[in-house]
Amino acid sequence: MPARRRRIADRAADVVRPLAAAGVGAAVAAFVAACGGSSEAPVDAAEQAALIAEGKDTFRFDTFGDERFWTDTLKMHEVIASAVDPLTALSVGLKVDSEALPASLVEAIQAGAVDLTKPATTLALLRLDAVVGVKGTVETVNGVDTLTRVGITCALCHSTVDDSFARGIGKRLDGWPNRDLDPGAIIALSPALDADGKASYASWGPGKFDPRHNIDGKNKPVVIPPAYGLDGIHSVTFTGDGTELAYWNRYVAVAEMGGQGTVTEPRLNLVVQNGIEDLVTAKLPGLQAYQLSLKAPAPPAGSYDVGAALRGKAVFEGAGTCSTCHSGPQFTDANIRLHPASDSMAEPESPSYASRSATKQYRTSPLKGIWQHPPYFHDGSAATLADVVRTYDTRRSLGLTAQQAADLVEYLKSL
């Protein structure tokens, strides 16, 4: 059995066990409902588990053939091989999966016997599939390990690690936005860019990416969003452009990352075709299934004041008027409506991110797990939850007392 299929089979088994423990029928019904389907069409639990496992493999390891962009166009394999040692990689927010490291290497790192200042060490980590979201082909050329191809996966931006081994090194946390990652700084290293291009990308800053920049030439990045807690939410992007994850996954895979396939968006007069072979479409169902299985993380024990959070819930539903839009179990009205740009606390901005989208509007962001991913608002203009509350209080003339504002922050931290 090929290694990739063996990994999928193993992961399918991991998914089937909890489904069986919870009751297969209920689990299947919940999965179908989450995908916008109908329980009238029975779905085999084992098949769904395999689909989720395949999606996990896609999320972590599939580049959709984007090596043609990152290698052939941007020449990032040359940059990595010559200038990106592990310490440099960690400094721009790249993460290392400690579970991909053999025990002997872990011991050597702990003993200080591994040189983390040499690009050759990065190549060794790539050979192990240990650099989260980066897929490299390392071949021996004239007796020397050589990085010949490099591509990226969904996990680059939408996964991080728990830092259990060291900062930036630990177990994967899929779905968690990597707000340490500085994709603009990484792209700016490309020798294929001119000075203006390098400056534009370098201006983004950590945790931000502009998914329209290479389409409309404008430069106004947004924060990397979570890829968890999306079960049951149909408008999955800041601007609600598509009604399912597969829409945005295709757009990013092809239009942004250079994956081999086609994406069309008539509302933007957009048609992008990379290559003649479609390496994207067949992977979208599994990828979506896996992402919908990712739950928002619960807040750490002791991270908020329980009594204050209870009072804050009353503020959230009352004086703060938050539940007017942040409603329902997902704390969003995104399945019902979108909002004009003027409703956004990040607007007015220039250029307006909404104006560059297909809907020209914003969705209400879901709040589960909000404690985990500062900064806030789509442009990252609020550094803390206290800043979020203060902004709403001022812009909406809510007249919250200091105690109400503080309690509301504690409630948000509890979600």
PLM features per residue range, with description:
Residues 32-34:
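C-terminal motif of bacterial Sec signal peptides marking the signal peptidase cleavage site
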Residues 1-16:
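N-terminal secretory signal peptides that target proteins for export/translocation
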Residues 8, 18, 47-51:
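Long, compositionally biased, charged low-complexity segments
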Residues 10-11, 27-29, 38-43:
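Intrinsically disordered, low-complexity, compositionally biased regions/tails
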Residues 38-56, 61-309, 313-415:
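Electron-transfer interface patches adjacent to heme c in soluble/periplasmic c-type cytochromes
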Residues 16-27:
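Sec-dependent signal peptide hydrophobic core
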